[in-house]
Amino acid sequence: MAGRKEEELKDLTLLGNQGTTYSFTYNPNLLEVFDNKHPDRDYFVKFNCPEFTTLCPKTGQPDFATIYISYIPDKKCVESKSLKLYLFSFRNHGDFHEDCVNIIMNDLIKVMEPRYIEVWGKFTPRGGISIDPYCNWGRPGTKYEKMAEYRLLNHDLYPEKVDNR
């Protein structure tokens, strides 16, 4: 199979060495997608994003997390540099942890329309408590909807210890 043609890459405006600008304001329009060349098979794409930061909506104090994003693409995949810049745009965004992971998932569903997606935020403890919100979604009316229900019900049967953060 040949590599990607220039025509396939024309809509990826953020990739490459072109003087990247970082947005400190939440901006879902930063997300870019490209065609999935393997739509005939199910496979997972997983992103581990250990440098996520956002602000507490009440105190303005910074919150830090590793965000895990896993999805089964359909026709589109998210481009990783655009995802990095998008996640960086949460830097001055004030929202609760639970809101952040749901916003991330909703924005990715909107641009990619995946078969299945899950987002798990593992936030560093503040005030002696860590918050690890998990959300997922499977395309309604398909096996992925059932998969989402199963994974939600079984996602944290063996919780990790927090001493690894």
Swiss-Prot record:
Keywords: Cytoplasm, NADP, Oxidoreductase, Queuosine biosynthesis. It comes from the Bacteria. Gene3D superfamilies: 3.30.1130.10. Enzymatic activity increases 12-fold in response to a change in temperature from 25 to 65 degrees Celsius. Displays a half life of 43 hours at 55 degrees Celsius. The active site is at C56, D63. Catalyzes the NADPH-dependent reduction of 7-cyano-7-deazaguanine (preQ0) to 7-aminomethyl-7-deazaguanine (preQ1), a late step in the queuosine pathway. Is highly specific for its natural substrate preQ0, since it cannot use various aliphatic, aromatic and heterocyclic nitriles, although it can reduce the substrate analog 5-cyanopyrrolo[2,3-d]pyrimidin-4-one with lesser efficiency. This is NADPH-dependent 7-cyano-7-deazaguanine reductase. It comes from Geobacillus kaustophilus (strain HTA426). The lineage of its organism: Bacteria, Bacillati, Bacillota, Bacilli, Bacillales.
